[in-house]
Amino acid sequence: MTESITTPNAVLYLATWLPSHLHVQFSAWCDDHHREQLVLPGFRRARRFEWTAGGRDDDPPQYLTMYDLDSLAALHTEAYVEHSKSSGGLPDFLRGHIRVQRRDCNVLAALPSSWWPPAHTSLLNLFQLNDDELAVGLQEHISTLTETSAAPIPDFTLRIIDSDNDEPIVLVDHDDAATAFIDTITAASGSLRSSWRCVFDEQSSASEQA
């Protein structure tokens, strides 16, 4: 077994904007691209989401892609660098038509703390913390809940992720049963919130065998 069975500690986060007439082709290409990435060392899981509501309603990204990583070191392995050089990059139909925002993020906190192996939930709520004190406060609150909670919320995972050059992001993976709880915690934050639906969710073969 080449990968650890520990909980992933990093996320490669990609927000994507592109014209609607390219969505079907883009999705088909992405499915294959995700599977290519999942054979690389340190890549544990690939997910892609479609935007449904909220956030930047004037110009929201249509898709989010997130790779769960052992650590950010996975983005600097010889295998990853070589794959990036040899993969050929974007297909011709996307060149000049796509805009991507990339963030290489560490996981600052998670609830539950041992959320791996993951639940395959269909919904994602994402909100940005525009105040460092909010991020620290939420992180401390999550630590307290992790220590004192008798039972986890079913099909629910909350993570705070952050990179060096932008605001922290809170990822809330859930199914319909947790929607009311999420409404409460996101409304209290006063932050920018968006909702997403999962359209791709696969793990690396090593993660599935662990």
PLM region descriptions:
Residues 1-210:
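Macromolecular interaction modules
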